[in-house]
A protein has these predicted regions:
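A near-ubiquitous, low-amplitude feature marking generic local secondary-structure context
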Residues: 28, 35, 48, 60, ...
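Short, intrinsically disordered low-complexity segments
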Residues: 84, 102, 128, 196-199
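Short, surface-exposed linear patches
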Residues: 39-40, 52, 90, 117, ...
Length: 205
């Protein structure tokens, strides 16, 4: 909301994008600091930082995308934008899942889990599918510690890679082209309909 309000007030999207990606990169870096003993207050603050940056991005990228096209093409432009965004969401799930599972398998190969049965359960994508407190708490305390350590390290790897993506996006925003957003609309939509009504009214009289 803050990003949208700022964009509406000043009509400049590039500074918002630069700041937003910088904040998001910082927030992802904070995520990598999480440990088993991290408090609820700490990870809640970390999430707020990432959400603040991400929210500023999502609410201001569409106007920037639309700024370069003619008003008659805005419908097609908006449809293309949402297609690209949904396509990105697909990769936003697939890539972290692949990174997570690969890291778990690497840790298991290093002997991170002492019980072969549990290691087999969480290998080959099993850890991603079974990620829940109920799953972890069914094991003895010693094995719970091992399983939590595997999950923590795999999750850290996901956020470490995410930092690269966010940092690269931040660098791209430094070279982002900025154009002045429209303050008035010069569209043909609605004019013919109004004129048609006037002609129809004149004919009926």
């Amino acid at each position: 909301m803050l990003g949208a309000i700022t964009l509406t007030r000043w009509g400049r999207y590039k500074p918002i994008h630069v700041l937003a990606f910088a904040i998001q990169t910082l927030g992802l870096g904070l995520f990598t600091l999480q440990r088993e003993e991290t408090t609820v207050a700490q990870w809640a603050v970390f999430q707020c930082v990432v959400s603040f940056g991400g929210g500023m991005i999502f609410t201001t990228m569409l106007p920037a995308f639309q700024a370069f096209v003619h008003e008659r093409d805005l419908a097609a432009c908006t449809a293309a934008w949402y297609f690209i965004r949904l396509f990105g969401h697909v990769w936003g799930v697939a890539i972290p899942a692949a990174i997570f599972n690969n890291r778990v398998d690497a840790l298991l190969a290093q002997g991170a889990i002492s019980d072969p049965l549990i290691a087999r359960i969480i290998s080959a994508g099993g850890a991603y599918q079974a990620a829940s407190a109920v799953f972890v708490e069914q094991f003895p305390p010693a094995l719970q510690t091992e399983v939590r350590a595997v999950y923590r390290q795999a999750t850290q790897r996901v956020f470490q890679i995410a930092i690269i993506f966010a940092g690269f996006a931040f660098l791209l925003t430094l070279f982002e082209k900025e154009v002045e957003l429209r303050k008035t609309l010069e569209t043909e939509f609605g004019l013919e309909e109004i004129e048609g009504r006037k002609e129809k009214a004149g004919t009926e009289k």
